UniProtKB/Swiss-Prot annotation:
Protein's name according to its UniProt entry: Large ribosomal subunit protein uL18
The species this protein was found in: Thermosipho melanesiensis (strain DSM 12029 / CIP 104789 / BI429)
Matches recorded under PANTHER family: 39S RIBOSOMAL PROTEIN L18, MITOCHONDRIAL, LARGE RIBOSOMAL SUBUNIT PROTEIN UL18M
Stretch forming the signal peptide: none
Key words of the record: Ribonucleoprotein, Ribosomal protein, RNA-binding, rRNA-binding
Length: 122
């Protein structure tokens, strides 16, 4: 009997193969993206120490008041702008983008564009 492969399991496998090549340092931390059906999350991680330096999501109070929907491209762009603003405040300008096994398309691409608009370089 042929079983249907789970999409999330395949994404996790892709993410592990990507993570072998992508590594965040103090000078260039990793901007990691995770998305669920209703929300999108982004965090900047220093892999040397294993610490999250900056985080933002559609669950943040700053965005919840202004967003009508949390699952569309506009919300993803706002999360990108917010994480970019917070990173610049902490002195982080260059990052390595980790798309989390997702295609660089739709909400993931919009988050990246929002972060670039805020001043992050990748």
């Amino acid at each position: 009997m042929i079983k249907k492969e789970n999409r999330n399991w395949r994404r996790k496998k892709r993410h592990l193969s990507i993570r072998k090549k992508i590594y965040g340092t103090v000078e260039r931390p990793r901007l990691c993206v995770y998305k669920s059906e209703k929300h999108i999350y982004a965090q900047i991680i220093d892999d040397d120490k294993g610490h999250t330096l900056v985080a933002a999501s559609t669950l943040d109070k700053e965005l919840r008041e202004t967003l009508k929907k949390t699952w569309n491209k506009e919300a993803a762009r706002e999360v990108g702008k917010l994480i970019g603003k917070r990173a610049i405040e902490k002195g982080i300008k260059k990052v390595v983008f980790d798309r989390g096994g997702y295609r660089y398309h739709g909400r993931v691409a919009e988050l990246a564009e929002g972060a670039r608009e805020a001043g992050l370089e990748f």
